[in-house]
């Protein structure tokens, strides 16, 4: 099921050696749960839209995932965001319950909140 898209996101991000050099293993789903040091990455599923044929057969889903990079240094946050993009964009994956057949960066923005530089990237994943 595409509801498990987080497994794909985590795998691709944690498999990136370049990203690991920048953030170690600080990749979290939805929340860090506890206070941690910078920099780190958080991801969350924003939406899931099922796709059906005219005969109502499910053909897959389009899943939107937001990945946020948090750092105390602006240039570092941008560098990490670039590595996140490299790790996810156009990457496919096969899992027990679903396959990721396409991944595209849909948007990116940045912010500064409570002494933290934030880079937000939104990806669209097509699954079957």
Question: In which residue ranges do the predicted regions lie?
Answer:
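Small/polar-rich, solvent-exposed N-terminal microdomains that initiate assembly or binding
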Residues: 1-57, 75, 79, 86, ...
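Short beta-strand or tight-loop elements
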Residues: 39, 63, 104-106
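Short, solvent-exposed beta-strand/turn "edge" segments of beta-rich domains on protein surfaces
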Residues: 54-60, 112-114
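Oligomerization/assembly interface segments of phage tail-like spikes and tubes
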Residues: 59-72, 84, 117-128
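Acidic-leaning, charged glycine-interspersed low-complexity segments
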Residues: 86-128
């Amino acid at each position: 099921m595409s509801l498990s898209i987080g497994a794909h996101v985590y795998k691709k991000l944690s498999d990136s050696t370049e990203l690991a050099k920048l953030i170690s293993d600080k990749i979290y789903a939805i929340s860090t749960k506890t206070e941690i040091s910078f920099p780190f990455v958080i991801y969350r599923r924003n939406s899931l839209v099922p796709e059906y044929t005219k005969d109502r057969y499910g053909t897959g889903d389009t899943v939107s995932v937001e990945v946020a990079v948090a750092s105390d240094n602006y240039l570092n946050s941008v560098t990490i965001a670039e590595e996140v993009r490299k790790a996810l964009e156009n990457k496919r994956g096969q899992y027990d319950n679903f396959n990721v057949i396409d991944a595209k960066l849909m948007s990116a923005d940045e912010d500064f909140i409570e002494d933290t530089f934030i880079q937000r990237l939104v990806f669209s994943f097509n699954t079957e």
